[in-house]
Amino acid sequence: MSRIKLLLEYDGSNYHGFQLQKNANTVQAELEKAIYRLSGERATIVCAGRTDAGVHAWGQVVAFDSCSTIPGDRWAYALNSQLPEDIQVLESQETRAEFNPRFDALKKCYGYLIYRQKKKATFYRHYALCNTEPLKLEAMQEAAEILKGRQNFRSFCASGSSARTFEREIFHCRLSEKGPCLLLHIAADGFLYNMVRIITGTLLEVGKGKYPPQHLREIIASQDRTRAGPTAPPQGLYLLQVFYPEDSK
């Protein structure tokens, strides 16, 4: 029995998220069907981040166990021959038997894309939040800096979370201009349910002048979800990269 580690990218537009769901098409379901077609095994996929419906990934990490004779570094080629075009395995390798993509992660990086033009966003509608209002970028960046460090982020967690603690450490949170878009890049040791989308919605409120950057301190201190901004839609969110202890060796 070998544990196989995969690095994936996928367009989440046509999926009801990553995780298996009854009577719904998911990324995990497509992967497990492809594994079965190749090896006859009913593998169970474990992932680094269970992305929601409509959310995309450039650097999702998953693992599964297999008794197949397919070499670890050939799983990528084999799976890509069976997967739909909106899911691609970028790399594959055999890894240590105890490797867990979710719990072994040291840091996860997400990006949120905001399209900011007055005209209709025909080609961005499935891949970015479309904003037509002027945004104060300096104010948004000042607010983003306040989020850095280890803090209680309960105000940025959607209801229904199973988290035991609301403390997380944000290593960096910055905004950059990418053509007609604004990219929020955020890295942390972990994220709460809808945390990045709520942070994005809150920073947009700052950018629109709804409240000043320093108001973020009050939102954090309140530990009250109703004090933060709205949850940004899923299509602008991307899982960019996941870091593990072995990556620094």
Swiss-Prot record:
Pfam families: PseudoU_synth_1. It catalyses: uridine(38/39/40) in tRNA = pseudouridine(38/39/40) in tRNA. Keywords: Isomerase, tRNA processing. The keyword tRNA processing applies. Substrate binds at Y110. SUPFAM superfamilies: Pseudouridine synthase. The keyword Secreted does not apply. It is an enzyme of class 5 (isomerase). CDD domains: PseudoU_synth_EcTruA (cd02570). Its EC number is 5.4.99.12. GO terms for molecular function: RNA binding; tRNA pseudouridine(38-40) synthase activity. One of its GO terms (biological process) is tRNA pseudouridine synthesis. The active site is at D52 (nucleophile). Formation of pseudouridine at positions 38, 39 and 40 in the anticodon stem and loop of transfer RNAs. Homodimer. Belongs to the tRNA pseudouridine synthase TruA family. This is tRNA pseudouridine synthase A. It comes from Syntrophomonas wolfei subsp. wolfei (strain DSM 2245B / Goettingen). The gene is truA.
